[in-house]
Amino acid sequence: MQLLGIGMDGHIGFNEPADHFVKATHLVDLHESTIEANSRFFNSADEVPKQAVTMGMGSIMGAKKILMIVNGKAKKDILMDALYGPITPQNQASILQLHPDVTVIYTEE
């Protein structure tokens, strides 16, 4: 079971929008928007790591089941694009359309 959330830009894990999907687990440079979103967990934005290790899409898609939990009206449009729009690395979550067993739980709160 793979448990996921989705970022405001469609990223899952730390797989940020890109020009291609990365299959393997890898080191990434975090986008400023991700650093800013995670700064609430630190005393200042300067303390937020600038890089992270993330599962790649091959690792995520290899899960038998995927559960994605999405909270907030602000993520509704990117979620709808991921679920019903084109499959594109610009919205990394869109690749989940190809997985045979994905459950999405969405709340507007």
PLM regions with names:
Residues M1-E109:
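Conserved phosphate- and dinucleotide-binding cores of soluble alpha/beta proteins
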